[in-house]
Amino acid sequence: IDFDEPFHKLFNQGMITGKNGIKMSKSKGNVIYADDMVRLFGVDATRYFVLHEMPFENDGIITWDLVIERFNSDLANILGNLVNRTVSMSNKYFDGIVKSTGATGDADQTAIDADLKAVVTGTRDKVAKKMEGLRVADAITEVFALFRRCNKYIDETTPWVLAKDEAQQDRLAEVLYNLTESITIGASLLHSFLPETAEKIVAQLNTTLREFDDLDKFG
């Protein structure tokens, strides 16, 4: 290859191996084909596994057990359950339309809201920094840290308890608004990696994907 400038750096992706780091081989019967993964789990789930489990500069291990585990723990549990719970409560309590009421609750609840918003609005720059260093797996991990924080927020605010108290309806609306806004920002960050999944999420939330430059703003 002809270069006009001195060759300074070469980025090389690690190898994809089977169980226990053993090289994939047809003779060993441990080859996993992308077409089979797509047929069983879909394009986005396959893309997620490959991007998340193939860390930069290191070899990545892929087995059917690992694929299923990652699908269940991350996509179904952390993300899927979060979206389903939020959409279900929004539909049940507010006919799917939630707006900010500014009801922050007591001092503890105010601090919880502030922490959620800090995590959410700070994720964009973390993702950008990881991507600048070609750390795709780490960038995806940052997005899922946002979703994990949202799940924790549900446990901290107990919207199902708020729903039983007529005096707490504004607070309930604020909690669900914060969740909807947070998930929308998370989905917008996820769109570069899992486009179909991100679009389905905002469709369920009745929101739209945001531009990257706006993902450090809440509300």
What name fits each language-model region?
Residues 1-8, 18, 133, 193:
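Secondary-structure transition/capping motifs at alpha-helix termini
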Residues 3, 26, 37-39, 67-78, ...:
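Secondary-structure capping and boundary motifs in well-ordered enzyme cores
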Residues 6-12, 202-204:
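Beta-strand segments within the central parallel beta-sheet cores of soluble alpha/beta enzyme folds
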Residues 16-20, 24-105, 208-219:
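Catalytic adenosine-cofactor/nucleotide-binding cores of aminoacyl-tRNA synthetases and other
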Residues 59-64, 121-129:
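Short, charged/polar, low-complexity loop and linker segments
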Residues 60, 129, 133-135, 144-219:
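Basic, alpha-helical terminal appendages of large translation-related enzymes
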Residues 76, 80-90, 140, 144-147, ...:
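Short, hydrophobic, well-ordered secondary-structure elements
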Residues 83-127, 151-168:
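Conserved, charged catalytic cores of large soluble enzymes
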